[in-house]
């Protein structure tokens, strides 16, 4: 097992974790139906970038 040679300070730990924060989901308005959806994802009614891609 790896064991650290010296204890890492709170500052170094914080600097390492500075990139771990989660960002909020980016939402867009669909041009066809006007509903909100996540970026780069198909809407609930099956549209993606103005085209019908899923038939239910």
From Swiss-Prot:
GO biological process: translation
Chain intervals for the UniProt region annotation (Disordered): 1-37
Bias-annotated ranges (Basic residues): 7-16
Domain of life: Bacteria
Composition skew (Polar residues), residue ranges: 21-31
Family: Belongs to the bacterial ribosomal protein bL32 family.
Family annotation (NCBIfam families): rpmF_bact (TIGR01031)
Protein name: Large ribosomal subunit protein bL32
Organism: Shewanella pealeana (strain ATCC 700345 / ANG-SQ1)
Highest classification ranks of the organism: Bacteria, Pseudomonadati, Pseudomonadota, Gammaproteobacteria, Alteromonadales
């Amino acid at each position: 097992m790896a064991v650290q040679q010296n204890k890492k300070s709170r500052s170094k730990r914080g600097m390492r974790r500075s990139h771990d924060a989660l960002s909020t989901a980016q939402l867009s308005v669909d041009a066809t139906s006007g509903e909100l959806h996540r970026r780069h994802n198909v809407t609930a009614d099956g549209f993606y970038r103005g085209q019908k891609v899923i038939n239910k």
